[in-house]
Amino acid sequence: RVWVSGALPPFAAAVRERVRSLGGRLDESQSPQDAALCIVTPLGEDASACAAREKLDPSRTVAIDVLLGLDKRRTLMTTPLTSPAMREAAHGLFSSDGVPVSVIRDSAGCVVQRVLAHIVNIGCDIAQQGIATPADIDRAVTLGLGYPKGPLALGDALGAHTVLTIL
């Protein structure tokens, strides 16, 4: 059984839908039943902090990064106490459709979240200092680095609240 935290409703809905589509059995209760795999969806925090805040058993808790969706790659984050059986259950479930899954150790937020938020932050700082216009910054990054979006366009897509929460 898989219990998904509802702390971030849009992320929780995406994970619940993915668990269903992968054939996982959802635990729909308010708090996880004994022995259920607990999935949290952190935004700017680690799996341990999520487990502590939500009073979850850290040995059954695994975080999944859903900031950029779940279609191309999935990143799971374990707590220092996550049992190998729960880690393997989460990996097995989320990789069952062939999408690559990476498992990382507990860290201060998910790697992709931190990198993207800092790129946005640096772009905003350059614009705020008047070094370049927002349009020029975005153009330079897309042309010079080959990024699909510039830092300010990325910030607009993610939303200021999301970026600030991650930072």
PLM regions and their residue ranges:
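Hydrophobic beta-strand segments of well-ordered beta-sheets in folded domains
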Residues: 1-3, 34-41, 59-62, 71-76
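Short, charged N-terminal beta->alpha structural module
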Residues: 2-27
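General structural feature for long, well-ordered alpha-helical segments within catalytic domains
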Residues: 11-15, 86-90, 119, 162, ...
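Internal alpha-helical scaffold of NAD(P)-dependent oxidoreductase catalytic cores
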Residues: 21, 54-62, 69, 73-107, ...
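Short, well-ordered secondary-structure micro-motifs within conserved domains or adaptor modules
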Residues: 25-54, 74-75
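Interdomain hinge/lid region at the active-site interface
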Residues: 146-167
